[in-house]
Amino acid sequence: MGVRVLRKNYLLIATSIAGLSISFAAQSNDQDKAEVFFENNMRQSSEDYVSSKIEQSIENRFRNLEIEITDLDGDDTRYSIFTVQPLYENLDAGRVTFFQGSIIALDDSETLNLGLGQRWLLNDNKIIVGLNAFYDNEWDVGHERMSIGGELLTSVGDIRVNSYKALTNGKTNDEGNEEKALDGMDMELALPLPYLPSTRIHAKAFDWEGEDGASDLEGDTISLRTALSYGFELEAGTTSYDKSHNQDADFVSLTFNVARFHSQQYVEQPKLISDTAYQLTDVTERRFEKVRRQNIIVKQEQTSGDFGIRFKGI
């Protein structure tokens, strides 16, 4: 009788232990699955977050991109890529700092432009005053140049002045001719047409100092520039030269601005017609506008032709 009781109790204990073991194993297995599930979701969430931040950063940088194609007198085509990147912005203090860079391809040569700009917003953000400095490098031949510039931007007109200084001496190009980068300056006045705030007429005068006894290259450029829908901009004009062997040249330029496209693709479009001819309004949106300047290095080339000297880059 005692043996039977002991055997029965032993079986009950063994069964209970087995049940507890199975239950513990099941719970342990569920816990492992939960840990794996949680770990995988955490990893996926982290990867999605990092990927989203990278894509957002790239997208924001890409939006500050401008692509320009210019047909020069039906002969040469110039391709340009610009970017303007904010470095500092304090609208309460009315001050912004930015970087501007560009790469320009023309006549089998490429030019790199790197610049820093500082702008101040004055008179309730109705006036922008700016200063800038640039470094230019035409690496195919090795020309280098720097410039400093100033600008005044308003809704009723703009004024820009740039002074250029060559940093290199004579260089030999692929044709075996000597080229020299020139010092010079330009001044531009831009005025919107009455009742057409998105259309401006630009008048620019320039003067490039000739080398080795050559006459200065002087002239002016007159153009009409208008903003179109979805980030496009069209400019057409002509360049005339004074006392130079260079012939007058016409040009047409089409620009696509990615930032303007993203902000205008749904509702915001350029204001083509205004109720008033001229009105001084807020120009805060222009604080990171591209600096207008002569990005191609102007050069004087010594040739063996009839005239012996010709100017390039303008």
Predicted region positions:
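Outer membrane beta-barrel translocator domains of Type V secretion systems
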Residues: E35-L122, K126-E138
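Flexible, glycine-rich linker and terminal segments associated
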Residues: S28-I58, L167-H202, W208-G213, A227-E235, ...
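N-terminal signal peptide c-region/cleavage motif recognized by signal peptidases
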Residues: S23-A25
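Transmembrane beta-strands of outer-membrane beta-barrel pores
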Residues: I69-D75, I103-D107, Q118-W120, Y135-W139, ...
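Repeated loop/turn-to-beta-strand initiation elements of outer-membrane beta-barrel proteins
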Residues: F62, Y88-F98, L122-L131, V156-V161, ...
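Bacterial N-terminal signal peptides that target proteins for export
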Residues: V3-I13
